[in-house]
A protein has these predicted regions:
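An N-terminal assembly and electron-transfer interface module characteristic of large anaerobic redox
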Residues: 1, 5-190, 195
Length: 195
């Protein structure tokens, strides 16, 4: 067996996220920064996307270890683990769900997240699920339209996230009651302030 045989066996076809899918698919996004991503979710909803940011639980690491090789970095285990935990939970229609992740195109393993995710889906028998690469054109997905409105909303969410994070880090050392600062910038409070 040569390298050519291995290449032929691999399935390099991917499921493209189409405009038709955009209408009724739930797009799952890994939690990478709770303050920022909780604001990003409604920002993208206002642009017509049914985005759901997944919770990061202690159990997601176990799912990541099951579906990713042991040589992968810790963040990639968490990301793949969040996706697989959600998909295997029974909460989602596996024929009406897509996954989204950024793809840098750089030397970091973050570029390989797409491959890790697709491999995990294949191992679990879920190859029909589209994996959307949110990148500067590495992969095309007609159902993801990064237009001016979406870019502005996403940037606003990130800026608000930075503001809330700075407030939290500046006030936390002076808390009279531990955890009070975090309660004051909880998700409902943040969303009420920016809407």
């Amino acid at each position: 067996r040569g390298l050519g045989d291995v290449y032929k066996r691999q399935n390099f076809d991917r499921v493209v996220f189409t405009e038709e899918m955009r209408k009724d698919y739930t797009i799952l996004c890994p939690q990478m920064s709770p303050i920022h991503f909780d604001i990003l979710e409604p920002a993208l909803a206002s642009c017509g996307y049914n985005l759901e940011v997944l919770p990061s639980t202690g159990e997601c690491l176990d799912y990541g270890l099951k579906y990713v090789n042991n040589d992968a970095c810790y963040p990639s285990l968490l990301v793949v683990g969040q996706f697989m935990q959600a998909l295997l939970s029974g909460k989602y229609d596996l024929n009406k769900v897509a996954l989204i992740i950024t793809q840098t195109g750089g030397g970091c393993r973050a570029t390989n997240y797409i491959g890790f995710i697709r491999r995990a889906l294949e191992k679990a028998g879920m190859e029909q699920i589209p994996v959307i690469s949110m990148s500067a054109g590495i992969e095309k997905n007609p159902g993801l339209d990064i237009n001016y409105k979406m870019a502005v909303r996403a940037l606003q969410a990130l800026i608000y996230g930075d503001v809330f994070m700075r407030v939290l880090y500046k006030t936390r050392p002076y808390e009279a009651v531990p955890g009070l600062s975090l309660i004051h910038i909880s998700e409902p409070t943040r969303l009420a302030l920016i809407s």
